[in-house]
Amino acid sequence: SDPSLAQQPVLQGGPVHQERGFVLHQTEDRAAQDFDGTLAVTDAIRVTTSQDILTAMAKGQGPRRVVVALGYAGWGPGQLEQEMAQNAWLSVPAVPRIIFDTPFEQRWQQSARLLGIDMSTLSSQAGHA
């Protein structure tokens, strides 16, 4: 078994189906291996929901760059599109360096920088000079 797997954090992906696991992984490492229940996020990033990826990881044969989460956040039909149209979300490309290498507490700031935004200059209050 792979001893580094014991150090792999498991994140809360959202409040829906918290018993379901999701593994976000980069395809570059060991790209020839296919897993059941895998969807492409980008050319370089996949999400897998099947148990075979966990078995491969435990044997040291799975992808090396992973994010593991339990649960997900869900939206009703058209809800996310409406929120995007209302600028309720900031959208950035999926950058493997940020997803897999940046410490969790810095990912939001690093992602905002892709848009030229320095999060430390934003305020949660408006209308006060």
Predicted regions: what is each one?
Residues S1-V68, A73-A129:
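A short aromatic-anchored loop/beta-hairpin motif
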